């Protein structure tokens, strides 16, 4: 049974807005296991700058790429439910490829609001490749997911798809966003299977939302002219369409906020980064 947005304690700060009132400010939850979802959030905010944004990340169970599908589904349901109990959500974006490949059906069954997922951009990469070799760079869970293999079977029959799963690259992206430096030698080691090929992929699918955060570093390691493709812009367009198609939404006056699952020294260090993205507060989500 779908869960409806909570409204019992929000009437003083939020109101049902009709088209005759001022432009509504519906609430969008962007969720990822870590900070990679900020790359998707940036794309969405460019199209929809006036939404009320919530960013939630699971720093307790991060990274998801090594977790079982059952664990991920239960965890994502728990987190989205906890956010929904405090905020009237208009839409949820699961900005995590690994979580999207396993949790979307369960989320859509439980909640009434639309849920958007992130999937590897196989189809556009196939259109862009010049040498017919496309690389999919993702977590191990995404690389081996049946959904990913189905995308390849449907859209890449005329191409050679080279799969490379790496949780180390996810950690590198987290390091960069926390202010650290990612040594190029680390990336070269991760990408060695491709770099050692006689004809490496000329188009790379960034199949994890963390990886667009490393495009500058990846460009220095990959062969010159290699194209990198992600699904952030497509997810933003889908989100904008779903928001615009809603007749009545609950408009929030709250500030943007970020939630983590535990507060520690790492989250303290991350707060200035989140503030630079437009999230002035970081709180522990009560789950």
UniProtKB/Swiss-Prot annotation:
InterPro entries: Asp/Glu/hydantoin_racemase (IPR015942), Asp/Glu_race (IPR001920), Asp/Glu_racemase_AS_1 (IPR018187), Asp/Glu_racemase_AS_2 (IPR033134), Glu_race (IPR004391)
Pathway assignment: Cell wall biogenesis; peptidoglycan biosynthesis
Catalytic function, reaction form: L-glutamate = D-glutamate
Keywords: Cell shape, Cell wall biogenesis/degradation, Isomerase, Peptidoglycan synthesis
Compositional bias segments (type: Polar residues): 1-15
EC number: 5.1.1.3
Region (Disordered): 1-25
One GO BP: cell wall organization
Enzyme class: isomerase
Residues reported to bind substrate: 32-33, 64-65, 97-98, 209-210
Molecular function via GO: glutamate racemase activity
Active site: 96, 208
Cited function: Provides the (R)-glutamate required for cell wall biosynthesis.
Family, similarity comment: Belongs to the aspartate/glutamate racemases family.
UniProt-recorded name of the protein: Glutamate racemase
Organism expressing this protein natively: Yersinia pseudotuberculosis serotype IB (strain PB1/+)
Lineage of the species this protein comes from: Bacteria, Pseudomonadati, Pseudomonadota, Gammaproteobacteria, Enterobacterales
